[in-house]
């Protein structure tokens, strides 16, 4: 998953 896309 994307860490800098986690709200």
UniProtKB/Swiss-Prot annotation:
A single GO cellular-component term on record: extracellular region
Major localization class: secreted
Keyword Secreted among record annotations: yes
Transmembrane segments: none
Gene Ontology biological process terms in this record: defense response; neuropeptide signaling pathway
Expression (tissue specificity): Expressed by the skin dorsal glands.
UniProt keywords, alphabetically: Amidation, Amphibian defense peptide, Neuropeptide, Pyrrolidone carboxylic acid, Secreted
Subcellular location as annotated: Secreted
Arginine amide: residues carrying this PTM: 7
Keyword Cell wall biogenesis/degradation: no
Highest rank taxon of the organism: Eukaryota
Modified residues (Pyrrolidone carboxylic acid): 1
Family label: Belongs to the frog skin active peptide (FSAP) family. Tryptophillin subfamily.
Purpose of the protein: May act as a neuromodulator or neurotransmitter.
Name assigned to this protein: Tryptophyllin-5.1
Lineage: Eukaryota, Metazoa, Chordata, Craniata, Vertebrata
């Amino acid at each position: 998953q994307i860490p800098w896309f986690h709200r």
